[in-house]
């Protein structure tokens, strides 16, 4: 069972499995009440992605970080999260650890309780950050790839894609973190 048919290596599932026995699309799952309806906002920034090179299915990480991890842009993303998400439990996907840290700082500067998780954290620090988020001590959690797959918190009701991507599979994985059903979710 998989929520997305796209693989990071660009291969389709038919390259891995002999037969796909059952398939449902995201719109079908939403229509049938298995996932919440999505409402998307695009926040325009001054980041110029037109000259970025690609690595496989996505932008080159270092170039992307240079283009988007800018104080002015992070402040705009933080204000947008504050205004649009309000009190919603939000996860924000960032390009690098520094980007996640800078966005977390920008959110906290606005009075939005935010934390961060990334793959190089000590496991006990990551567990504490996740517990703070689940228990409401922080309402925004910035991250770098850690919450993309295998993270299941139905209380997440807002996803902020602070890292542009050309990879549809990655985008679907990230957005999918906010589609789980949960009592009172709006």
Model-predicted segments: where are they?
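Conserved helicase ATPase core of P-loop NTP-dependent helicases/translocases
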Residues: 91, 100-108, 112-149
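A short beta-strand-to-loop transition that corresponds to the Sensor-1 phosphate-sensing loop
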Residues: 1-5, 94-96, 144-146
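Short glycine-/polar-rich loops that comprise or flank the Walker A/P-loop
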Residues: 17-19, 35-38, 110-113, 154-158, ...
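Conserved strand-helix element at the start of the C-terminal RecA-like helicase core
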Residues: 63-110
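Conserved segment of the helicase C-terminal RecA-like domain
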Residues: 164-173, 177-186
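SF2 helicase motor core recognition
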Residues: 33, 140-159, 175-180
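Post-DEXD/H (motif II) to motif III coupling segment of the RecA-like Helicase ATP-binding lobe
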Residues: 1-40
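Inter-lobe coupling/hinge segments of SF2-like helicase ATPases
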Residues: 28-75, 108-113
